Regions:
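Non-catalytic, conserved peripheral segments adjacent to functional cores
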Residues: 1-95, 116-118
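N-terminal secretory/targeting leader peptides
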Residues: 120-123
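Conserved metal-binding segment of the jelly-roll/cupin
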Residues: 94-115
Length: 123
């Protein structure tokens, strides 16, 4: 089990996608695999070459799970915890549809959109 509150770096996840003749079903979040209390769920759409970020919440910091529903992005995550050994370290991830990223609350986050249409879900 991944306990999000204990993470000290981002983690890329490959989600399980079940496909058949009708289409597909993707397990985005399973509580038995990831211990995570989220306060909201939002979707973001971005066209090709859009850059978003670097975002973080200072007063009400929160962990995030980012899931790519459609498209491809280059995701950048930066450690902003000043007393951390890895303060300022940048992590880069290329995420495609069906992949997710867990981002600890002490990290800023941004991405560039690579596909014509990109749809992301945040928890």
């Amino acid at each position: 089990m991944i306990v999000v509150s204990k993470l000290n770096k981002p983690i890329k996840l490959k989600q399980v996608i079940h496909k058949d003749l009708r289409g597909s079903l993707t397990e985005i979040f399973l509580r038995k695999k990831i211990k995570f209390n989220f306060c909201k769920c939002i979707t973001v759409t971005s066209k090709k070459n859009v850059i978003r970020g670097l975002h973080f919440q200072k007063k009400f910091a929160q962990h995030k799970i980012l899931f790519v529903l459609k498209g491809t992005i280059n995701d950048f995550v930066v450690n902003i915890k000043k007393n951390s050994k890895t303060y300022g370290k940048v992590y880069k991830f290329k995420l495609t549809a069906g992949e997710a990223l867990i981002i600890p609350k002490t990290f800023a986050h941004g991405y560039s959109s690579l596909a014509k249409e990109n749809i992301l879900i945040y928890f």
